[in-house]
A protein has these predicted regions:
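Conserved beta-strand signature within the Rossmann-like core of class I S-adenosyl-L-methionine
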Residues: 113-121
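Core SAM-dependent methyltransferase catalytic element
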Residues: 127-148
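A structural micro-motif
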Residues: 5-7, 115, 131
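A short glycine-rich, Lys/Arg-flanked "PGG" loop and its adjoining helix->strand segment in the class I
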Residues: 101-113
Length: 148
């Protein structure tokens, strides 16, 4: 599948039901058809009646847990919790400016120095001094700025 890659996918949600659904990896046809190209569906999911189930080789790379990203400490604090890519899409829409600032400071700490942060299209870092905005193929993403 991704031969030679050391890939780990970590997912969090504050809602236990959402985490449970992600762990099950089973999605109805209607859910799958919302924005996921057919070539990815066929490659990474098995068809089971009206549902699509994440293939075992993909599922073993995925770890989900219930977590509150607004808490005082991010759920990823260990030295080995350095991420190359973080997708934090449409998460901060409901947070205050101060909460966004605290969350993104924590994200900055766990993102590898050459890592990439993807936010939702209407989201921006609360503290732009920590981030460099880049554009590639119409997609905006952010890299952490390093202290000088």
């Amino acid at each position: 599948m991704l031969v030679g890659w050391n890939l780990r996918i970590e997912g969090t949600d504050i809602c236990a039901d959402v985490v449970e659904k992600a762990q099950a990896g089973c999605y109805h046809r209607i859910e799958i058809n919302r924005g996921l190209p057919a070539r990815f569906v066929v490659r990474y999911f098995d068809h089971l009646g009206e549902d699509w189930v994440v293939k075992p080789e993909v599922k073993k790379m995925c770890h989900f847990r219930q977590a509150n990203l607004c808490g005082p400490v991010l759920p990823f604090n260990r030295a080995e919790d350095r991420f190359d890519v973080i997708f934090l899409r449409n998460v901060m829409l409901y947070f205050s400016q101060e909460t966004r600032k605290v969350l993104l400071a924590g994200i900055h700490r766990v993102l590898a120095p050459d890592g990439i942060l993807f936010l939702g299209s209407s989201e921006q870092p609360a503290d732009p001094s920590l981030w460099t905005a880049l554009l590639a193929g119409g997609t905006c993403y952010f890299r952490p700025r390093q202290p000088s």
